[in-house]
Amino acid sequence: MCAHKKVLFSLFASFFGFTVANATTVKLGTSDLCLKAAIPVAKRLNTPRGLLQAISLKETGRWDQKRGMSYPWPWTVTAGGKGIYFATKKEAIDKVQALRQKGVRNIDVGCMQINLHYHPNAFDNLDQAFDPLTNTRYAANFLTNLYKNNGSWNLAIERYHSGNTESGTKYRKAVIHLKEHAAG
């Protein structure tokens, strides 16, 4: 396995709980914050392995030409169906404030794209909303409650995205594909 592929494999394997012999050490950066945040949250809430990472990738995935793969991005803001990736947390917060000043209310933020309109009490402030661990923890608690209420992780994934069955089903299929692809 070439060094580049070994680094990528090692990075994803560590996020999904696999041990890699002779793995190259990988320094985590902004592009790794969402995946890193999901690890302790998933363990604490006993969500299926790789599910939070796959949802984060589906919600905020962006392509990295150097890595040759997509990764979730913590400073993502989505409004009007358009996701925007910002270089810093401050830029993302500034964008949300500007959108709110324009009267836009339906805004998704952070690693797990929590909707600030439908989840108005999720965070005390925008700094918390964009904190990868806090954002992921809220999403995982919400997802776990959906699982308890629906009796199925598949339904929980669908409802996490939408109450619309058709849209939810498409979303679930995409998330499961990402989960299986990254773990396999």
What role is predicted for each listed range?
Residues 1, 17, 51-52:
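Generic low-polarity alpha-helical segments
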Residues 1-8:
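Bacterial N-terminal signal peptides that target proteins for export
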Residues 9-10, 176:
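General helical structural elements
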Residues 10-17:
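Bacterial N-terminal signal peptides
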Residues 19-23:
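Sec/Tat signal peptide C-region and signal peptidase I cleavage site
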Residues 24-184:
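Catalytic glycan-binding domains that act on GlcNAc-containing polysaccharides
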